Amino acid sequence: MTATPGAVPEVPPIRLDYPTLGIDMPVIPTGVTEDGQMEIPGDAATAGWYRYGKAPADAVGHTVIAAHNSSPDTPVGPLNAIAGSRTGDEIRVEDSAGHDYTYRVLSVEHVNKNELNLEPYFSRDATPRLVLVTCGGEWVPERNTYSDNVIVIAEPLT
């Protein structure tokens, strides 16, 4: 995921709760790797929030939260389940100030990584959205990754 740093919001998300899929996981701020990709926590049990993007309390822009779908310590990560997201599902995000933000799923996309343009998902000035991202599709051993990204887009309710 290619990302470009911007200003850092003051109140980061700390927890992601998606009851329909049994997801309840911590979220930590992450940045950008040396090759310009969004940094993802090594353990699939923890999600990363793109700290140069928008936070749930922001009036505009996308809040991007991503996690690996598996890792050595967590063979099946919680975000692996987002492939089963359905339009209308509710997702809750808690921030470090203790505020809860509820979102409703608008879409779930399965996009081949070779065809993926992530720039629109990282928008800082678009209509507020929650964007969840993980890997999906088939394992590609020669690339040491999966063939697709699974991307869930949700709109704020509160």
Predicted segment positions?
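Solvent-exposed, non-transmembrane regions of membrane-associated and secreted proteins
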Residues: 1-85, 90-97, 107-158
